[in-house]
């Protein structure tokens, strides 16, 4: 069947279809949500016939539409969106299991100064420039135990021969691990951010 908004378009076309395109663009008619399937806003006329019987194909080689059933108009939003009369908006609730709460365990003892931080952070010093790899596990683990073997713990090792003679460079990886760990459940792959700290020699 026809869309409930089609009578509005035909009515608008019969009233103002004879105007020039410039004048037609200034005309708009407000929609009745109860009569237009819940649509708020305004409609305006397109240029030309809103529902031509023959619709020319825009692609070379394809046949024209000889029995067009499509009606066209321009939709303009209203300034303030509103629900239909009698419609009650439901309160948005999170889907079950859609997201895991990030914990704040250990943030204070690890020196996290951001009071909004809701993550558990581990810091380890590793050799080399750049991220050594994405550490993850699929089983319960000790949050204070070494996490993976892709980046060895080297507390006092400098970066190498390119280190300045006046000090050593160390890389620190910060592991943001959502959920798991201390609760006994498996942890998700961690997001690793790396920074470089220059330690002067005493």
Swiss-Prot record:
UniProt cross-references to InterPro entries, sorted A to Z: Xrn1_helical (IPR041412)
Positions of the UniProt region annotated as Disordered: 137-166
Pfam families the UniProt entry points to: XRN_M (PF17846)
Anything else known: Contains several arginine residues in close proximity which may be involved in protein RNA interactions.
Name used for this protein in its record: Cold-regulated protein 2
Organism this protein belongs to: Hordeum vulgare
Lineage, highest ranks first: Eukaryota, Viridiplantae, Streptophyta, Embryophyta, Tracheophyta
